[in-house]
Amino acid sequence: DGEGEPAFGRPSRFERWFIDGESASGKSTFVMLLGKKLCDYGRVDYVSLEEGANLSFKKRIKRLGMKDVAGKFKVVTGLTVADLVARLERPKSANFVIIDSVQYLDVRSFDRLKKELFDRFPRKSFILGAQVYKGRPKGKMADDIRFDCGVKIHTKGYRAYCQGRYTDDAEAYFTIWEEGAAKYYLTE
C-alpha cells in the first residue's frame, strides 16, 4: 500500500518476489526499504549472504532508520538453507524472508531450493535478491527463480521497475533515491 502501489500493485501475501539489478543500481537499498515496509505486516528475516554485516551494510541500516523496526526486522548472516529451514520451523518465525543474494546460497539447484524452502513454507513470503550479469540474472538458478516468482522487480538508476503480474502500468516505478535517480537519468 502507499507510494509503492502504482509500481508494484497489490501482490498476494504469500508471494515470492525476485529483485535484481546491476551493481550500484540501488538494489540493496530497495530490498532493505521493502523489508522495513513489510514490518507493518509481520516479522522479517533479512538473510544477508552477499554483504554479511560489513560496514556498507551497517551504514545502510543506520541511513534507512532500521532501528525503528528493530523488534520485527532481524538480520541473520552465514546461514545455510538447512539453517534457514530450522529457523523457519520455530514458533513465531518470520512471515517474510529476504535472501540477499541467491548467488550466495549453498544450494545450486532451483528444484532443490523449491522443495526444501518454498514448498515447505507455503505460508511465508520470500523476497529473493539477485546479481545481474550482462542484463540477465547471474546463473541458471537465479534465472529459474526469476521465472517462478510472481513479482519481478528490476532496479536501474536508483529506480525499481515491476515486471510482474500485479501492475497494469509497465512504465511505473518506485524511486529508491531521488538525488541518485536525478543524476542517472539526466546523464543517460
Across the structure, where does each feature detected by a protein language model lie?
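Conserved catalytic network of the ASCE P-loop NTPase/AAA+ motor domain
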Residues: P11, K37-D40, D68, L88-K92, ...
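Phosphate-binding/switch region of NTP-binding enzymes
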Residues: D119-E188
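Alpha-helical scaffold elements adjacent to nucleotide-binding pockets in ATP/GTP-utilizing enzyme cores
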Residues: S56-R60, R112-E116, D144-D148
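Pre-Walker A adenine-sensing motif
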Residues: D1-P11
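Active-site-adjacent loop/helix micro-motif of nuclease/hydrolase catalytic cores
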Residues: G26-F30, L105-R112, P137-K138
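Phosphate-binding/switch loop-helix module in NTP-utilizing enzymes
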Residues: V75-G129
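Conserved P-loop
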Residues: S12-A82
